[in-house]
Curated annotation (Swiss-Prot):
It comes from the Eukaryota. It comes from Saccharomyces cerevisiae (strain ATCC 204508 / S288c). This is Putative UPF0320 protein YNL337W. Contained within a telomeric X element core sequence. Belongs to the UPF0320 family. Pfam families: DUF468 (PF04318).
């Protein structure tokens, strides 16, 4: 499987542990805009409603924008690409 697996992601309260939702996984493929979501039937509807909220989208966008700045590994990659 290609991409990153965000296991147990429950977007609204970010304080929840992934272990609280062991059956809900999001697989993100960086090869294209394809998202594969697997979950128990009891989780699918409420989670999809919460994922598709504007609040979650903005929060996710902020996390993805801030994470490279906090990660030395990402900073090194960006610095290397900038020099080349």
């Amino acid at each position: 499987m290609h991409g990153t697996c965000l296991s147990g992601l429950y977007p609204v309260p970010f304080t929840h542990n992934s272990h609280d939702y062991p059956h809900f996984n999001i697989y993100i493929s960086f090869g294209g805009p394809k998202y594969c979501i697997t979950a128990l039937n009891t989780y699918v509807t409420p989670l999809l409603h919460r994922i598709l909220t504007t609040q979650f989208i903005y929060t996710y966008a902020n996390i993805t924008k801030k994470s490279p700045l906090k990660s030395p590994k990402h900073k090194n990659i960006l610095f290397f690409n900038h020099n080349t």
